[in-house]
């Protein structure tokens, strides 16, 4: 079970409140019913993240069955292609891609999707290792490990 502090948007986001909590198909997902994709293929829809941790944070959402590994593979492939194109065009220095699977891992929308986060050199200094997905987010102010209280 998640707390309000962990996912404050869940309790206040009308799109999430009005959506099916565990959709069985893409057409029942919160994204399909409340937003238009930035682009899409026959297997993947790409949306801007409603709560971005960095400018350009996108979600790559499988349109295939949520139990079909080909769908999530396609989402990762599309995110990777876009990231490499952004690097080639000089729009970003690097990027993170990843998933949260299950509430204990931070998932708040229960349909498979890949987070894509563009990164710039030095975009988050002073929080441990200078690279990696953890540095895309500001430190948790409630964490006992946070040295910036």
Predicted regions and their residues:
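HIT superfamily nucleotide-processing domains
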Residues: 1-149
């Amino acid at each position: 079970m998640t707390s309000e502090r962990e996912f404050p948007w869940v309790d206040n986001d009308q799109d999430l409140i009005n959506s099916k909590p565990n959709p069985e198909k893409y057409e029942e997902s919160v994204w399909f019913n409340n937003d238009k994709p930035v682009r899409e293929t026959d297997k993947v829809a790409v949306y801007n993240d409603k709560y971005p941790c960095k400018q350009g944070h996108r979600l790559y959402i499988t349109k295939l069955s949520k139990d079909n590994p080909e769908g999530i593979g396609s989402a990762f492939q599309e995110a990777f292609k876009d990231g490499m194109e952004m690097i080639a065009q000089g729009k970003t220095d690097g990027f993170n891609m990843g998933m949260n699977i299950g509430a204990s891992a931070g998932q708040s929308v229960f349909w498979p999707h890949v987070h894509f986060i563009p990164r710039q050199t030095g975009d988050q200094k002073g929080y441990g290792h200078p690279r990696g997905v953890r540095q895309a987010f500001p430190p948790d102010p409630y964490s006992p490990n946070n040295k910036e209280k």
